[in-house]
């Protein structure tokens, strides 16, 4: 009738404007429904609801006699609400990407974590672990992370699920339309039933269930200097079961202490300390803090070391004042035929996580140092969490004393879950962890153990939060489809009160959002 035409025109213009503002959602959603190659998307269900509601208004304008305001509800309001929910999720995503980009483009040296893909290196460094199908996450220092924007725009994990439900929802809508049209012989009610099914079944939180966990993950990870670009990276990090770490990660400063010095001649004790500190001063090893500490961190006391050579897993060889100086393990001394005390003597001094460091000068034993390794409480808690999550460790060792037995004892790690790389294995892995000016990766971090593991935990929290929300969303779509079909058969769908429909959608959205909000990141 003439009295309803202004209302229909107004509602049509408002919904069409909303759809135009969300044109990417409309285009992507409908294209995803028609062309499966375009990829999965969470835009299809709100786009279908908007199209059906626009079609409802157009049909009522074309056939005014079909529209009875007393018995039929216009679905333009719920459809616009669904588009707003979709846009809200995308706005949160945009803020997350912006904040991540600020961290990534800071121009600082970082490290990128990525999955080791070289099959040969992978077999070499994981041989001996109990993990049958190792997926190793390694880190390399870099200045720029490549592919950040592409990773940020990757498909959400829940998109595939929502795309499948979109087809189910459309089938229910078409079935309700045909039943109402053929059984009740009422075209106006049939178009209302179609729009009603799609507006009732489409989730308000379709993009929010991914955007909210990603946002909360970003905030948590940023506090420890970590950045995970997008859902593709979260999924890949979730498949990792082996982490590459260093001895410095496992034994931070203060965990290794000096328990005794036994020079061959007592008068050489000061020289033994200076020689040892000089040899380790410029080496990346947790042992150097002990010896530099004995000199009061006064580098003026140190001697110049020439031709310093690192022998992986054994120690260091260099020249001081024309004399060859060696500091390291028994194996290093045996390699150069240095006369040492008996193994029985060494065993008496290597109980309770203690180790002996030998210093030789000019081919003769000069001094012995006894050091003790203690577990770090924070590191122990992290390793226990990793163990319960099924993660193993490969230790790219920068401490010649560190071995599997020491780590298993210090941190109560099961046999087969930790491996210390040999010199050959270290060389095989070295190109994969060497510095590059720019590198692809799945996570950017500060290079510290806390930032590395904290980023992994944040990503795992986001994945778990989205998974639980996705289960709620799936239940909401299925229950809504069943309710919509029952109401369509009973003839009550066309007259569904709009406030009730809006509250129904909001209730499901709130329920879905609870899980990301209570999830630990």
Please state what every model-predicted region is:
Residues 149, 158-159, 262-312, 334-336, ...:
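ATP-binding catalytic core of ATPases
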Residues 23-33:
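C-terminal ends of transmembrane helices
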Residues 35-47:
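Cytoplasmic-side transmembrane-helix entry/capping segments in multi-pass membrane proteins
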Residues 54-71, 180-188:
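Transmembrane helix-loop junctions at the membrane interface of multipass transporters and ion channels
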Residues 134-135, 320-322, 361-505:
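Conserved ATP-binding TGD loop and adjacent catalytic N/P-domain core of P-type ATPases
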Residues 14-25, 76-105, 112, 130-242, ...:
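Hydrophobic alpha-helical transmembrane segments
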Residues 233-260:
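Asp-based phosphoryl-transfer active-site loop
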Residues 7-11, 62, 296-406:
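Signature of the cytosolic headpiece of P-type E1-E2 ATPases
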């Amino acid at each position: 009738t003439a009295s309803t035409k202004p209302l229909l025109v107004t509602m049509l213009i408002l919904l069409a404007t909303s759809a135009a503002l969300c044109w990417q959602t409309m285009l992507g959603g409908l294209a995803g429904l028609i062309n499966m190659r375009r990829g999965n998307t969470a835009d299809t269900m709100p786009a279908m609801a908007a199209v059906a509601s626009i079609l409802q208004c157009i049909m009522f304008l074309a056939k005014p006699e079909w529209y009875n305001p007393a018995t039929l509800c216009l679905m333009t309001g719920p459809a616009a609400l669904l588009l707003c929910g979709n846009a809200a999720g995308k706005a949160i995503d945009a803020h997350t990407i912006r904040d991540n980009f600020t961290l990534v483009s800071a121009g600082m040296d970082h490290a990128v974590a990525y999955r080791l893909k070289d099959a040969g290196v992978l077999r070499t460094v994981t041989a001996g672990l109990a993990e049958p199908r190792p997926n190793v996450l390694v880190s390399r220092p870099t200045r720029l992370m490549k592919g950040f924007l592409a990773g940020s725009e990757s498909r959400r994990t829940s998109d595939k699920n929502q795309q499948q439900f979109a087809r189910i929802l459309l089938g229910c809508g078409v079935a309700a339309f045909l039943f109402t049209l053929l059984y009740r012989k009422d075209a106006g009610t049939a178009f209302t039933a179609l729009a009603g099914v799609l507006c009732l079944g489409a989730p308000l939180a379709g993009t929010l269930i991914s955007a909210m966990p990603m946002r909360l993950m970003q905030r948590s990870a940023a506090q420890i200097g970590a950045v995970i670009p997008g859902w593709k990276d979260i999924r890949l990090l979730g498949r990792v079961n082996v982490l590459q770490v260093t001895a410095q990660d496992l034994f931070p400063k203060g965990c290794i202490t000096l328990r005794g010095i036994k020079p061959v001649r007592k008068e050489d004790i000061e020289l033994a300390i200076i020689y040892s500190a000089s040899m380790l001063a410029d080496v990346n090893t947790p042992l150097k803090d002990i010896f530099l500490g004995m000199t009061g961190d006064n580098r003026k006391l140190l001697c110049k070391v020439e031709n310093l050579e690192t022998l992986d897993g054994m120690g260091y060889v260099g020249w001081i004042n024309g004399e060859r100086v060696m500091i390291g393990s028994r194996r290093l001394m045996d390699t150069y035929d240095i006369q040492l005390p008996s193994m029985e003597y060494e065993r008496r001094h290597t109980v309770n996580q203690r180790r002996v460091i030998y210093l030789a000068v000019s081919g003769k034993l000069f001094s012995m140092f006894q050091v003790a390794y203690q577990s770090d409480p924070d590191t122990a808690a992290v390793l226990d969490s990793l163990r319960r999550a099924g993660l193993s460790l490969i230790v790219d060792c920068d401490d010649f004393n560190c071995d599997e037995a020491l780590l298993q004892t210090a941190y109560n790690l099961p046999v087969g879950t930790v491996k210390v790389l040999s010199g050959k294995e270290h060389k095989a892995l070295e190109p994969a962890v060497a510095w590059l000016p720019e590198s692809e990766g799945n996570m950017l971090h500060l290079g510290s153990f806390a930032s590395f593991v904290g980023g992994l935990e944040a990503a795992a929290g986001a994945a778990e939060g989205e998974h639980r929300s996705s289960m709620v969303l799936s239940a909401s779509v299925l229950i809504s489809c069943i309710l919509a079909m029952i109401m369509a058969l009973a003839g009550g769908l066309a007259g569904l009160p709009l406030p009730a429909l809006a509250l129904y959608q909001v209730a499901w959205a709130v329920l879905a959002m609870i899980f990301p909000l209570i999830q630990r990141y």
